[in-house]
Design a protein with these regions (language model features):
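Gly/Pro/Ser/Thr-rich low-complexity, intrinsically disordered segments predominantly at protein N-termini
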Residues: 1-196
């Protein structure tokens, strides 16, 4: 007897939203596939929390920091994505079909993990960079003191990598952020975890 492999049907966005409302974990919607997001390590979670503190203290004007629960709709690619943090300036803009998603982040932050780094600095970055509102896309390593910032300047994307001893600026913030402040009491200067 031959076994038949049944592939799941592609979901539509309404299916995705229904699943998100009852799920205990977050999912992204990519090309009709509902993809579960992995939980973070101790370092990942502490770095994400530290970024919330550092960015929240530097908010200016109508700009505000949003944690990892904020969903984004990438209209040009029909995708629902999450980030580890973001800054939205002005009122959040919501697509008609999803009142919980926004479409206008100014800055998106991802804390890299081995399982997500390829996507975070690849297809996911490209998805977010397709948003007209996005001015910076930030990748924060969790295994070394390193921050990579993609910035849009006059319609073109450039990238700068910052290491221990450097500081970096982001649009919308009142002051620069020292890389060392992100990792304080989390990683030592060699990248060794201080949490173990």
């Amino acid at each position: 007897m031959q076994a038949t492999l049944r592939l799941p049907r592609r979901a539509n966005y309404a299916d995705y939203l229904a699943a998100e409302q009852t799920s205990e974990c977050r999912h992204e919607f990519i090309d009709g596939v509902i993809v579960a997001m992995a939980g973070g390590s101790d370092e990942h979670n502490r770095i994400t929390g530290r970024l919330a503190q550092l960015l929240g203290r530097r908010e200016t004007g109508s700009c505000g920091y949003y944690p990892s629960d904020q969903r984004f709709w990438i209209a040009s690619r029909a995708r629902g994505r999450y980030s580890d943090g973001s800054i939205i300036c002005g009122p959040p803009e919501h697509p008609a079909h999803d009142a919980q998603a926004t479409t206008n982040p100014t800055v998106v932050i991802e804390v890299l993990s081995p399982s997500s780094e390829g996507d975070d600095d690849g297809e996911k970055r490209s998805d977010f960079q397709s948003l007209a509102s996005l001015e910076a896309y930030v990748l924060v390593a969790q295994d070394q003191r390193r921050v990579k910032v993609y910035r849009r300047t006059e319609g073109e994307w450039g990238v700068t990598t910052y290491r221990d001893g450097d500081s970096f600026e982001l649009p919308t913030l009142s002051s620069s952020i020292p890389v060392a402040d992100i990792y304080e009491r989390i990683l030592d200067s060699t990248g060794k975890s201080l949490l173990r």
